[in-house]
Structures are given as structure tokens and as C-alpha cells.
Amino acid sequence: DLPLTDHCPGYPSLAKFLANAVRDATYDSLATPRLHPVKFIEVMGRDAGWVAAACALGFSDSERDLLPLIFMPEQPPANAEAALAEISDRVNRDGFCVCVIPETLRDSPGRHFGGDEPLSIDAFGHPYFPSAAAAMTRLVQEKLKLRARYERPGTAARMSVSLASSVDQEEAYGLGWAAAARAATGASDIMVTLDRVSDAPYQCAIGTAPLSQIANRVRPFPNGFATTDGRGITDSFRAYALPLLGEQPFPDYARVDFSRIV
């Protein structure tokens, strides 16, 4: 979510990991919806929906009916009751709900679902709050009387080398080389960046930007990348993000058409 760059190194691999994990979690719920009708997946991202949005990338056109319910930080639910109503509607419609939430899920007034007392504060002044997914799981069990569970991939999502994007690996090497070359010439107070040249075929060029315009700033998830209700992604985001994941990032899954079984 850094400004002045198309994306950050590491994001493509994180996106690939989470897109696969959420798709797998959805097929698990599809197979056994009564085991846990509600499943929360808590992901990194305090104020911007880049990571949460990536969780919906693994679903093909024929799987659009399986898309997860995503609560973007930029478009939070009005309150806990509103969030529960959306989850309940999805369960009534599909028999289950896979819900992606940011680690610091808040309601419209800014109250943290996990509690407003931070557990810790990092060197940059970023507070770390109790798990939003744990709090939402309790609410679903208490208010909706449904079985629920939550998953927290945590840092595993950004350090799984076995699922790294080939595009990410190539770009990270190029960025490191470019940064070292500029440092060798005495350049300072800059960050090497990725500048999008084209989507199809995908191409990014390496550039630079002043560090003073990047540090401690956040690039919000664009309105055009999220659906109007803030609970899903648009084809514009798919066109932006899918090329970052490399070739064939998702396995093919078969689905049984139960309507044709006699």
C-alpha cells in the first residue's frame, strides 16, 4: 500500500498465497457446509484493502458464485449488527459464508471489532489490536447461533517461498540490483519503484521516487477496484493484479453439478 509505485515487491507472492488459501477454504466449506457454516480469514492490512482484495483473485468466471464476502477497510460495516446481517444473508443464500476481514476491522465510527485497547505499538507508531476474527467468531456463535471458526495466515502469507510468484521473484531481483547500483553512485533518500507500462502483456519499468513522499503514507485501495458495496473486487482489479501472480497460479478444480444427478 505504498504510494508512487505500482506495487511493492512481495505483494504478488502474498496475493498468490492468499488467493489459493481462500479458494481452498471455500471448497472445503462447499464440501462440508454444516461443519462450520461461517469461516473467517483474517489478513494483514490496517487501513487499505490491497491484501483483502487479493483473496478473491483465485476464482474463475465459472466460480463467481463462490466468491468470499470481503470487508474492505475503506468501506467498513456500520456496526457489528450490520456485519452479522451480511454474514447471515450469505449463509441463507449459499449454506455457508467465507468472510475475509482485515486484522484491524473497524465499524463506520472507527471502533475496532477486536477491542480498542492495543496489545502493542511498533517503532513506527502502528498499534496492534486484538484479533478481529476471534471477536467476530464469538459474535456469530452468540448472536447467530452458528458454528464458526477463524484462520489467521499471518506472516506465513508473505514468506512462503514455495508459493512465490515468478513475476515477483524476477522483479525483486531487478529492484535490488537497481537499488544497489544507485547507492553505489551516491544516490540517497530515494526508493526504487515499479511503474506499470502495460497490463497485457504485463510490463513494469523500474523508476525512483523521493523517500519523503512515501514513508508513513498509505495508498488506499482505489474505488474502481472494489464493487460498489465494498464487499468484492471488480474486473479492473483482476486486470491489474492477476498478471502479478505469474503463469497458472491456480490449480484446476472439478465441481459436481448436483442438478444433473438423478
Task: Show which residues each predicted segment covers.
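Accessory alpha-helical/coil subdomains and C-terminal extensions
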Residues: 8-149
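Sparse, context-dependent recognition of short Cys/His-centered cofactor- or disulfide-binding micro-motifs
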Residues: 3, 24-26, 83-85, 177, ...
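Surface-exposed loop/turn and secondary-structure junction residues enriched for glycine/proline
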Residues: 5-7, 47, 54, 73-75, ...
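C-terminal non-catalytic interaction/assembly regions of soluble proteins
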Residues: 112-262
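Glycine-rich, charge-decorated loop segments at or immediately adjacent to ligand/cofactor-binding or catalytic sites
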Residues: 1-7, 160
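Short, ordered loop/turn segments at secondary-structure junctions
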Residues: 1-2, 74-76, 103-105, 153-156, ...
